[in-house]
Amino acid sequence: MQIKEVDADSSIQAEEVNYYSEGHLCKGYIAYDAKMKGKLPVVIIVHEWWGLNEYARSRARRIAALGYFAFAADLFGDGKLGRDPEEARALTARYYAHPENTLKPIEDAITKAGDFPQADISKAGAMGYCFGGYVVVNAAKLGAPLKAVVSFHGRLVGVEAKKNLLRAKILICQGADDSLVPEADQVAFRKSMDSINADYTFISYPGAKHAYTNPEATELGQKFNMPIAYNAAADFASWEDMKLIFHTVLK
């Protein structure tokens, strides 16, 4: 099974929004169901290392269709995109080298979401893909005001978790055949989470490689000689697991 795209004639409203983070202009993207009454729980979405592209926007629309106010954040500023791994590596370097840099962009995205009358930022969650998964998990560990965080095939390195800072329930959706997230990193992550009795769930999807949620991953992997591939079954299963945690914690 595959995740159903939002129909063009649905009541989902979506638009690009400008906001500032650390003094830089960012071009985010919001989506929400105009038929929903009252304020909606917020889900911040962080893109892959390719940037806030149509894939990330489509996920925002799907989140909106579930009854959330979706805010796709722009972590590179000015809507920059990585056209190849070299550019993407340069755009993500400041975050991978200094994981503490992940906190402010998430806080700023939540603040901007709060400007919209449809958004209830007291019920905020976050999700991210690859690079984005790394970002949202580290931001949560640094104390971001999030109730639930979901990482899809994200790197599991970064800051050490501290019980007094981590407030979110965490879901890790990991591909069992992901060679870009070493087993040693997975073991270290679990050990760190267990050491503070963190509320987390770690799910491994059989046969899934890195970037398994992106329908373009197989083509990109072939183009750039990267060990990534789309896996429809894992994409669907992880989406269902994400839906459950957000419904349980945010609604």
Model-assigned labels for residue ranges:
Residues 172-174, 178, 205:
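Short beta-strand/loop motif that positions the catalytic acidic residue
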Residues 199-251:
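C-terminal catalytic histidine-bearing segment of alpha/beta-hydrolase fold enzymes
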